[in-house]
Amino acid sequence: MAKKPRNAERINNLVVVSDLHAGCRLGLCPPTPVRLDDGGHYTASEFQQKMWSLWLEFWREWVPEATRGEPYDVVVNGDALDGVHHNSTTQISNNFEDQIRIADAILRPVVDKCKATGGAYFHVRGTEAHVGKSGIYEEQLAQRLGAKPNGLSQYARWDLWKRVGGDGGPLVHLLHHVGTSGSAAHEASAVNAELTASFVEAARWNREPPTYIVRSHRHRFIAVDMSAFNGYAGAIVTPAWQGKTP
């Protein structure tokens, strides 16, 4: 049973991961053999075992240090599954139930630990090519793992607005997609444009702008910040837990 936090409305920490691409031979996969639909098993490659060790280091060492042992919410910001896409040949299985089973094995310990601290688990839908039309397979995974639904009873939502730290705390907007660039010299351009656009839209409709925006999709981490009404605003693009594919 999840422990109720000291203040159910005040969570000071938001941990965001994305782009696990479970079901890909270069995606995240637990080291324990995973049962497939036909009764066979898949065993993680040497590369996947190395990636898994980094995943464990992140959750066992970095997260407790960064959150100072306080409750935290977890957001999976899209593309938890690899899907069947772009004529690729790197899938462990083209059966989505197999891919969902792998993602469940990856995320369930994370979700259980999050809820045990008093936090909640949220899921944002990713790319149609990976998670199905309307994010159908990511919706199934999120419901299976007990994600907190939105007002439409969607367990995997298109975006998430989250205030961190209670009343007066920073407002965060999370969405999977963001523009990309083929040039390292312009890698920050789309991210800066996304942050700027969020301020323009907020002003246009007389709404509070986000202090932070979080995006994923590009598989490369970058953070951009600028001076703002509250002193500081930032845009963060999360890295992937998948190796480079052919």
What residue ranges belong to the model's regions?
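N-terminal active-site segment of His-dependent metallophosphoesterases
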Residues: 1-98
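Beta-strand-turn-beta hairpins that frame and shape the catalytic cleft
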Residues: 4-15, 161-173, 228-233
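Structural motif
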Residues: 12-14, 71-74, 120, 170-172, ...
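Divalent metal-coordination and catalytic microenvironments
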Residues: 19, 79, 103, 126, ...
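Active-site neighborhood of divalent metal-dependent phosphoester bond hydrolases
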Residues: 52-53, 81-155
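A structural motif corresponding to the C-terminal end of an alpha-helix
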Residues: 61-72, 105-121, 207-209
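An acidic, phosphate/nucleotide-engaging active-site surface
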Residues: 132-189
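Conserved beta-sheet core of the metallophosphoesterase superfamily
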Residues: 167-246
